[in-house]
UniProtKB/Swiss-Prot annotation:
Binds 1 FAD per subunit. Homodimer. The keyword Oxidoreductase applies. Contains 2 FAD binding domains and a single NADPH binding domain. This is Coenzyme A disulfide reductase. Its cofactor is FAD. It comes from Staphylococcus aureus (strain MSSA476). The gene is cdr.
Length: 438
């Protein structure tokens, strides 16, 4: 009976194991997870902190006991894989509760260890990062136990923005700092102005080009020379792949510690796959490498690897489009395609339109800004971005499907919109992009 070992029990690992069991009732499947919880919703964590998700239990899909009962898959939490011997096809596992080590053999090995939050490295009792449910519980408990009021949020990526909004909605007083003037880097820089407007509207302090210089208790000294007091600091300064344990194996890592994979999510070593935040692949619509550490990619990779292991060796990954979205107070920011800093590799043109998200005479209308970049050589769409209070999500999802099917910007005129005054226009913003590009 084949033995399948999975490293990591969150989006990629747990999903892959579950899909394998759906296709294969016989194999022995075991998952090692170094942390306390398995199969939790990472994307829910800021909303648990903000008490938008009223009970943390809704963010936890399975316990190991429930997972085994439903799927006959063994999950061992607090068990960290610390080494791989790919020649003998074994992994070395550390039981983090007992500090004991043991070896586990495998026929197939699936690596989905995820990534860890970067830290600024200050020794302080008031600094936190947010990456898992344990972090969420620690933040929530600290807020309650210490009557937290003023919170410093460091960083201006998606997670930091979501955390800041949820702290504010919880009734706390957050302040945002970021080390540069480039916030929310997945979005075009000039389309981020509503983020600052939303902060100003609520009188939430923020400072760009600012960093922490020192922390002494609750006293924070900044690079600008300012000295302020905060009850809590939440750091959102990026992540790094959990690949240290892989370095002693023959598995190839790139210079940043990620694992390059082929279209079957195979590594360079036979019988070893990599999925989720640890893996790098390529874009679907252009010939460029892509690392997209988001939920859709982990789930898609999990399904493909499960099919491969179950015997369907014809299924392959066609690449990422990098579709992403974030809510920040009243606004939605969404984009798809290559990142803004990758556009310079193409000869491109940009076309954009700003108009109401639905018919102007229908109540509740607000501006929606839609922008599309296309390759001048073949007129195929490279990137699209949308910002507004309404309708950004559906326009970007439609454009994602257009890019998936290699439509040209001109063909957007043929998009048949589901039109009624509360929802759109007879000529939708997507149509207008196509007309303006001609």
């Amino acid at each position: 009976m084949p033995k399948i070992v999975v490293v990591g029990a969150v989006a990629g690992g747990a999903t892959c194991a579950s899909q394998i069991r759906r296709l294969d009732k016989e194999s022995d499947i075991i998952i090692f997870e170094k942390d306390r919880d398995m199969s939790f919703a990472n994307c829910a964590l800021p909303y648990v902190i903000g008490e938008v998700v009223e009970d943390r239990k809704y963010a936890l899909a399975y316990t190991p006991e429930k997972f085994y009962d439903r799927k006959q898959i063994t999950v061992k939490t607090y068990h960290e894989v610390i080494a791989i011997n790919d020649e003998r096809q074994t992994v070395t596992v550390l039981n983090r509760k007992t500090n004991e080590q043991f070896e586990e053999s495998y026929d197939k090995l699936i690596l989905s260890p995820g990534a860890s939050a970067n830290s600024l490295g200050f020794e302080s009792d008031i600094t936190f990062t947010l990456r898992n449910l344990e972090d969420t519980d620690a933040i929530d408990q600290f807020i309650k136990a210490n009557q937290v009021d003023k919170v410093l949020v460091v960083g201006a990526g998606y997670v930091s923005l979501e955390v800041l909004e949820n702290l504010y909605e919880r009734g706390l007083h957050p302040t945002l700092i970021h080390r540069s003037d480039k916030i929310n880097k997945l979005m075009d820089a000039d389309m981020n102005q509503p983020i600052l407007d939303e902060l100003d509207k609520r009188e939430i302090p923020y400072r760009l080009n600012e960093e922490i210089d020192a922390i002494n208790g609750n006293e924070i000294t900044f690079k600008s020379g300012k000295v302020e007091h905060y009850d809590m600091i939440i750091e959102g300064v990026g992540t790094h792949p959990n690949s240290k344990f892989i370095e002693s194996s023959n598995i190839k890592l790139d210079r940043k510690g990620f694992i390059p994979v082929n279209d079957k999510f195979e590594t360079n070593v036979p019988n070893i796959y990599a999925i989720g935040d640890i893996a790098t692949s390529h874009y679907r619509h252009v010939d460029l490498p892509a690392s997209v550490p988001l939920a859709w990619g982990a789930h898609r990779a999990a399904s493909i690897v499960a099919e491969q292991i179950a015997g369907n060796d014809t299924i392959e990954f066609k690449g990422f489009l990098g579709n992403n979205i974030v809510k920040f107070f009243d606004y939605t920011f969404a984009s798809v395609g290559v990142k803004p800093n990758e556009l310079k590799q193409f000869d491109y043109k940009m076309v954009e339109v700003t108009q109401g998200a639905h018919a102007n005479y229908y109540p509740g209308n607000s501006p929606l800004h839609l922008r599309v970049y296309y390759d001048t050589s073949n007129r195929q769409i490279l990137r699209a971005a949308a910002v507004g209070k309404e309708g950004a999500d559906k326009r970007i999802d439609v454009l994602s499907m257009a890019m998936m099917n290699q439509l040209t910007v001109d063909e957007l005129t043929e998009f048949e919109v589901a039109y009624a005054p509360p929802y759109s226009h007879p000529k939708d913003l997507i149509n207008m992009i196509g007309y303006k590009a001609k």
